[in-house]
From Swiss-Prot:
Organism from which the protein derives: Chelonoidis carbonarius
Chain's gene name: HBAD
Binding site for heme b: 58, 87
GO cellular component: blood microparticle; haptoglobin-hemoglobin complex; hemoglobin complex
Lineage: Eukaryota, Metazoa, Chordata, Craniata, Vertebrata
Family statement drawn from the similarity comment of this UniProt entry: Belongs to the globin family.
Signal peptide: none
Subunit structure: Heterotetramer of two alpha-D chains and two beta chains.
Name of the protein described by the UniProt record: Hemoglobin subunit alpha-D
GO molecular function term, any single one: organic acid binding
Listed PANTHER family: HEMOGLOBIN FAMILY MEMBER, HEMOGLOBIN SUBUNIT ZETA
Length: 141
C-alpha cells in the first residue's frame, strides 16, 4: 500500500520521465534482455540489437502503460485489466518477467536521475512497480 507521500514522489519523478518514455523504455528492455537473456524468447520476431526500432517502439508502449498506472494509482486493476488479459491469455508471458522488467526500469531511473533517485524514491517506485506487477499477474490465478 502506497502512502500519500510515496504517491506524490512517484508523480513528481514521473514528470522527469515524460519526454523520455521511448528512451527509458528501450533502455529498460535492453537491460532486461542482457541481464535476463531468457526473456528474449517472448520477442522472437524482434530485432534485439541496440537501439532497434522495434525495441524503442515497445519500450515506449511499456512506459506509456506505466504512465497510465501512475495517473490511476488508486485503481490499478481497472487501469491495467486489458494489459493483464493480453499478457495472460494471448501472449502467455511468465509473470516473473514483470518483476524483472520492473527491476531494470528502476536501474534506468537511477541512472538518469542520479542524486534525485533517493532511497525514498526507490522505495516508492519499488512498491509501485510491485503493485503493477501483481495486477498484471492477477489473471494468471
Amino acid at each position: 500500500m502506497l502512502t500519500e507521500d510515496e504517491k506524490q514522489l512517484i508523480q513528481h519523478v514521473w514528470e522527469k520521465v515524460l519526454g523520455h518514455q521511448e528512451d527509458f523504455g528501450a533502455e529498460a528492455l535492453e537491460r532486461m534482455f542482457t541481464v535476463y537473456p531468457s526473456t528474449k524468447t517472448y520477442f522472437p520476431h524482434f530485432d534485439l540489437h541496440h537501439d532497434s526500432e522495434q525495441i524503442r517502439h515497445h519500450g515506449k508502449k511499456v512506459v506509456s502503460a506505466l504512465g497510465d498506472a501512475v495517473r490511476h494509482m488508486d485503481n490499478l486493476s481497472a487501469t491495467l485489466s486489458e494489459l493483464s488479459n493480453l499478457h495472460a491469455y494471448n501472449l502467455r508471458v511468465d509473470p516473473v518477467n514483470f518483476k524483472l522488467l520492473s527491476h531494470c526500469f528502476q536501474v534506468v531511473l537511477g541512472a538518469h536521475l542520479g542524486r534525485e533517485y533517493t532511497p525514498q524514491v526507490q522505495v516508492a517506485y519499488d512498491k509501485f512497480l510491485a503493485a503493477v506487477s501483481a495486477v498484471l499477474a492477477e489473471k494468471y490465478r
